[in-house]
Amino acid sequence: MPFALGQRWISDTESELGLGTVVQVEGRMVTVLFPATGENRMFSRAEAPLTRVIYNPGDSVESHEGWSLAVSELTEKDGIVIYHGIHSETGEQVTLRETLLNHNIRFNKPQDRLFAGQIDRLDRFGVRYQCQMLRHKLASSDLLGLQGPRVGLIPHQMWIAHEVGRRYAPRVLLADEVGLGKTIEAGLIIHQQLLTGRAERILIIVPDTLRHQWLVEMLRRFNLRFSVFDEDRCVEAYADHDNPFYTEQLVICSLELLRKKKRLDQALDADWDLLVVDEAHHLEWTEEAPSRAYQVVEALSEVIPGVLLLTATPDQLGHESHFARLRLLDPDRFYDYDAFLAEEDSYKDVAIAAEALAGNAKLPDAAINSLTELLGEKDISPSIRLIQAEGIDAEVQQAARSELLQELLDRHGTGRVLYRNSRASVKGFPKRFFNAYPHAMPDQYQTAARVSGMMGGHKSLEAKAAQALSPEKLYQEFEDNSASWWKFDPRVDWLIEFLKSHRSKKVLIIASQAETALSLEEALRTREGIQATVFHEGMSIIERDKAGAYFAQEEGGAQALICSEIGSEGRNFQFASHLVLFDLPLNPDLLEQRIGRLDRIGQKNDIQIHLPYLEDTAQERLMKWYHQGLNAFELTCPSGHVLYSEFAEDLLNVLVVDDSDELTNLLNHTQSRYKELKHTMEQGRDKLLEINSHGGEKAMAIVQRLAQNDGDTHLIGSVIRLWDIIGVDQEDKGENSIILRPSEHMMFPTYPGLPEDGVTVTFDRDTALSRDDIALITQEHPLVQTGLDLITGSETGTTSVAILKNKALPAGTLFLELIYMADASAPKSSQLYRYLPPTPIRVLLDKNGNDLSAKVDYASFDKQLSAVNRHIGGKLVTASQPILHPLFAKGEEYAQVVVDEMVAQAREKMTQQLSAELSRLESLKAVNPNIREEELEYLRNQMQELNTYLDASQLQLDAIRMVLVSHV
């Protein structure tokens, strides 16, 4: 295409960007700026999805200054069109270079296509209209961002995501207990922030071992393609940009990478919108000597507007550590540790009042006094009288309790900054049962251990303990590859018998090392032909998906999945309830992570944990410490990290040297400290915080709405028709799933996001949750969004001609169906779509210009129509032109009335909602310092911006259908 600087083009795929200007032509690329949204797009000159905008004599064009020009002629100079005509305000003869056209101009292209005989198939018009309706429905939903992720509809998770994800630059601490889904909550918030335009650039910082887990979670659950950055990736990225972090929008990296000053400086300069830090409780801090890791996150949190910290429960690592994390979120608010402790003491009165309100009994005097003092600026006596009165309707009393609870939540505690759910407050978890199976130590292992003892004097205590826990690895090191430990290890014999006696059960087996997992698979296959598959860190994501799918398959699938420690990260298998621990990890957190593969919300059965171990070895001693000291097999142990830190040296000594007295002493001390920590945590429970974190009835209402949307058969039918029109091959696979593949006859050359070898999808959430290799299709899924964009961003379905066979009407009767879009060009981040979403406006005119759309609905009218071929349709349009021209003007009049009303309603809704929220936050700021000034300033600016965008809203003709009555 011939491009020149200053020319005006419109994007065929993103028409909402408005009129674009060519700002750079270099080599094979052209860059177009879209001033209406402030966005740049770079295209290949040869294949740019752009249409040149040139007006004709008779057209009216608008300058960027607001005045119009009635075009009489046009000339061209250096590739730039110059329009000549009459100035609308002065009446003078003037010229206007195309570069100075108003960038908010919209184009009624369907009219031009109709009169040029470019007529689409009838079904494409219908699909286009449905696509616009789907876009409107999605944009106007207050649950935008929650429907699409492949996650269970868990109330507390959806509540936190709904509350936090809607905020501008949220800065919160997610501190749920293990197994309650902090990663999912963070993913939901990220998904919402991206989909709503509140964030575009996101940096996730995780420990080295969790980078892959986050990559998998973000892709498989949220359809978000993050890039993992390490030193090698940074070096490679220099070819594209001086700052490697600018080469991707969504980045995962480790703290280790950012410890390097050069990389940290680059990250600080990369203009992120949201920072997410996992395992934030490992950021060590003291007032005198904060750790390097803490300083890295602190520096980033000072320049990045939004911050999510994922951490262990606040009680787990002590108050000072908890304060340090809150300080990262708001250093002005949490500036002094002593002041923080004093404030925490005052929360006890709040907790007492909250506990009383959350119950059903009458309020004790102490609670009433606390409430009166805490809510001093509000007269609460009417609510108190309702709660205390006899014979009052239970719903009325509950409403009064809820109102006072909400007042407490708004005004006290860290509810806007901290979310923490515990298993005590969230129901739905299975029970855990521990089964241990002792076996004698084989002679071969004893010999290998003796030889190693003579040779390994230089090894560290931890290395010796790890060696003692994995005798099979030690044996294999001393023997050549022809020796196979699994031929004599009694644990393998037990495993084979166990699987044979539980043939109908799915069994997850976890071992520390990938080599162990591979050997076990070989043993099961060669000795008994048991169907098992492996899952380890040496496999690609696709290979792991296939292994997981093979295991999940009910018929013909693997009975057992054998995972390595690292390989199992980020994968959950709730459909299985038997877990075999072939060995034990040294760290209690890793043990909980193993059990957590099955022990999640959504697990429908009790979990049976099986441990085959070698008697009188380090394996037995570690098992006793976990079971008798921490009760870590049958209950989650939030204090496991603290206990391991305190007793690590004693534990390692006991594992390396068999001393029964030392073991007994260690178990007694561990039990005592475990009970002490458990009691402290129970005492420290903040009832108000728990109520705010799990959301109660409001959370249930959100989940019910999402569940209703899941069963929307209209959506399923619309999406299937969309894929049919585009030409995507669809093969029914059974199990509520279909395979989508690109075909040779697709309407578009490519379908972004649809792999060449296809993808298996389902509309059923339960099916998607049980199968990692099946994508969950909702209106938010990229394959649906891309399909909608392909249709609505192209000319597909913009014109159509149809026949209405109805003898009750005279033959030749003409109807003109016009679909307009009420829209305004605005950046996603403005949130304009919440008040004025892209809205299709249907006008159905008879030949006299009467609008029949209120009397004749779209669906019933569409069913009566028959298609005509393009050639005949063109002739019918040509013959009807004298009637059609005045009807277009009439249709625009009707649609403009609707748009004006919609804009007025949008302005009223926006002003009402934002003013109310601003007023609420301003009044709360006086009593709750957790309200940030940045949030208030954002709301004030947003109101001004939205009014400007609403003023610029316009009407755009999107599609035309001409209908003629025939009796033939």
UniProtKB/Swiss-Prot annotation:
Binding site for ATP: D176, E177, V178, G179, L180, G181, K182, T183
Short sequence motif DEAH box: positions: 278-281
Protein name listed in UniProt: RNA polymerase-associated protein RapA
InterPro entries reported for this sequence: Helicase_ATP-bd, Helicase_C-like, Helicase_RapA, P-loop_NTPase, RapA_C, SNF2-like_sf, SNF2/RAD54-like_C, SNF2_N
GO molecular-function term, one example from the UniProt record: ATP binding
Biological processes, Gene Ontology terms: regulation of DNA-templated transcription
Presence of keyword Isomerase: no
Coiled coil location: none
EC number(s) reported in the record: 3.6.4.-
Assigned protein family: Belongs to the SNF2/RAD54 helicase family. RapA subfamily.
Described function: Transcription regulator that activates transcription by stimulating RNA polymerase (RNAP) recycling in case of stress conditions such as supercoiled DNA or high salt concentrations. Probably acts by releasing the RNAP, when it is trapped or immobilized on tightly supercoiled DNA. Does not activate transcription on linear DNA. Probably not involved in DNA repair.
Origin superkingdom: Bacteria
Helicase C-terminal domain ranges (all copies): 491-641
Residue span, Helicase ATP-binding domain: 163-332
A family per Pfam: RapA_C
Assembly description: Interacts with the RNAP. Has a higher affinity for the core RNAP than for the holoenzyme. Its ATPase activity is stimulated by binding to RNAP.
Class in the EC hierarchy, top level: hydrolase
Keywords per UniProt: Activator, ATP-binding, DNA-binding, Helicase, Hydrolase, Nucleotide-binding, Transcription, Transcription regulation
